[in-house]
Amino acid sequence: MAALRSPVVMIHGAFCGGWAFDGWRALFKSKGYETYAPDLRHHAEDVEPPSELGQTSMLDFARDLEAFLDELGEEPILIGHSMGGLLAQMLAARRPVRALVLLAPSAPWGVLPATPFEYASAQALYLAGDFWNRRLWPTHWIAAANALDNVPDDERQSVLDRFVPESGLATFETMHWALDLKRATQIDPRDVVCPILCIAGARDRVNSPGTVRSVASRYRGRARYEEIAGHSHWLIGEPGWEKIAALSLAWLDDVLANESAAAGS
């Protein structure tokens, strides 16, 4: 049971809050894990974020999360969804992490999109003007058609009702990394030394299976890639999410058991 006591920190994606992992947290808690799902800076529900959100960088989010992990004082397991998956990679390159579970992760600097749709999405946002300097309010019909397309109508609306504005700068750094002179999301894959599970939804258009596969391939033998048939982007809450969480738990059990065996040999 000692291995199971590692804290699990779940990092949400764009336009969300820690609430997005409520189901996962309950399931992991039932298996003996201590879990946390902090809100990123200015992502609290029912509070209009300050204008500063628009200029909040992925580096700011990463620094905040580093401070959170410092307070925990233990080597964590990180689970990240979408943009949160990119933040999890950034953290694992900076500090010791026991394991990473990346759910439909956004790709770091240098990883090209795998599909025309991903290119078109980035181009459409770029044509909207200087979005990188301002807050981005969620566009519900876009989210419904893409990120939440596999969620039943009644459940989809309840998720959309909880969406919050996002940082234009962080979105720019994630979707338009080739134009980011600061290379905010650049990661040397050699700095990420923990085991990694990368999971893609076979129907995901936001972060396509090809893109997620490219993320996994950066980490060579340390990463396992899984593509889940019938699933889209909202792997943390669309119907059948429980089997994805169960897959993650089983993988973690194997990783921690192997770690314990190696330590005892």
Predicted segment positions?
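Catalytic active-site module of serine/aspartate enzymes centered on a nucleophile-bearing elbow/loop
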Residues: 222-265
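Helix-rich cap/lid subdomain of alpha/beta-hydrolase
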Residues: 117-162
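Gly/Ala-rich beta-loop-alpha elbow adjacent to hydrolase catalytic centers
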Residues: 79-84, 88
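Conserved alpha/beta-hydrolase
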Residues: 29-49
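Flexible "cap/lid" loop of the alpha/beta hydrolase fold
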Residues: 96-133, 170-178
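Conserved alpha/beta-hydrolase "acid-adjacent" motif
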Residues: 205-211
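Short beta-strand/loop motif that positions the catalytic acidic residue
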Residues: 192, 198-200, 204
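Active-site glycine-rich loops that stabilize anionic/oxyanionic intermediates
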Residues: 13-16, 82, 202-203
